[in-house]
Amino acid sequence: MSQTPQQFHIQAKVALKDPQLRANFRGAMDYLRDKRKTAFSDAKEEKAIRDLAESIRQRCLSKLPTLLEQLEQKCSQNGIYVHWAENPEQANGIIAEIAQRHQARMIIKGKSMVSEEIEMNHEMAKLGIECLESDMGEYIVQLDGDKPSHIIMPAIHKNKQEVSDTFEKNLDGFTPTLDVDELIQTGRTRLRQKFHDADIGLSGVNFAVAETGTLCLVENEGNGRMSTTIPKVHIAITGIEKVVEYLADVPPLYSALTRSATGQAITTYFNMITSPRKKGEKDGPREVHLVLLDNGRSQAYQDEEMRKTLQCIRCGACMNHCPVYTKIGGHAYGTVYPGPIGKIISPHLLGLEATKDLVTASSLCGACGEVCPVRIPIPELLQRLRREAKHDAKSGNTVMEGQKAAHSNLESMAMTSFAFAATHPTFYHSATGLTTKMQALIPNKLGAWTQCRTAPKPASKTLHQLLKEKQTMADDHSGNKSSKDKS
């Protein structure tokens, strides 16, 4: 059964009952958090990096329409074909047209979350075009008929034994092993010839530079470089928000990205593509296409508050520090982008009605906002989306026209009742006092919260009563002391 955001609560329960999954994530999350902590060991340096990254992203977003036009102009001058796609259907149509024009039977893919967003593999398969993942994590989950569970490390939910089992099941002649180097070498060996066999190479884009028309790709495995240089045709696909103004904007963002994602000062490979192969050059594609996808991004851009979601540089740090994601993993969310960032991006892509359960799946602890390298105020945006999801248009906080979710009358009544009690002290004190006297009648199971916890027993005395008694004792003590002094 495929996961969907509408089934989040069911999927989360299934994940929580899987001890192996939780163990896999516990080890992986601890590792990634430690790596980031080491990379940002100097608090002043961390602040400086994040300050600069935030200011660059905000500046670039403030000029987004102009920068996109400039990017198109520069790319066209460089010989890169630029295509605009309003939605996944248009994006897949563009890619399909290019593939069919070149009579392509295989597309070799570098890392691309946007290709997951548009379900490109599935759509190309309908046309008889094979899409083969070359990122090792993506390759593993593709072999298993699975989906990525993390935007940086797609197979993070699998341990060595599970990877070995996947290879044994899908690769002829594979000898089971738990040696990580051997597992990686097996994947590389099977993929190497595929780069030469592929008719088209496809990649994502980390930064698209408007000043020069340059496409920047960040990676550690070398598959991105091979998939963009060996095939005769290269297609790069990215969201419209990835544009930056100047080439000088890239190094600060690159530093913030790598440190936050994997704890590295720099990645093993950093690719810059400015044109197809020129006369006299020995490698590189003969044709380069850039597909710029909207898919709800321009709608978010029009909202001054929700525009901040477009600052994201896809590092995954918020996921690694989220107490919800680290317990249930990415599949439970049922969306391409899981975790905290997914909760505020997915409503633009799928609508708030479909994703309303995700925005409440948060403790609002603020850890995601504290580690975000571009300082997206994720907790505040989640609260904004919660208001919209629960109160519909009645709250006066319309997030995105046409994407409002239904509100719960029962929950609204409960919140209204609490607000009344909290603003009327006499009523509040009477109600809490009555609760302590009737605690024997309160059931042990109080909804979903107590399905995995023991409901706490109300104290025999309320805080107000304890404070009153303490004040009385203090007054008595003060009075006794005063009497002794007089005598």
Where are these regions (language model features)?
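The feature marks the mature, well-folded catalytic cores of soluble enzymes
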Residues: M1-E305
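Intrinsic disorder at enzyme termini
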Residues: T4-F25, M29-R33, R384, L410-S487
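Generic, well-ordered alpha-helical scaffold segments in large soluble proteins
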Residues: Q70, K74, N78, I94-I98, ...
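Short coil/turn segments at secondary-structure boundaries
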Residues: G137, A265-Y269, T398-M400, N409, ...
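Acidic/polar loop patches that form or flank catalytic/metal-binding clefts of enzymes
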Residues: E245-L247, A261-I266, N320, P379-L382, ...
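Ferredoxin-type iron-sulfur electron-transfer modules in oxidoreductases and energy-metabolism complexes
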Residues: G280-T309, V324-N444
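Conserved, hydrophobic alpha-helical core segments of structured domains
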Residues: L310-A317
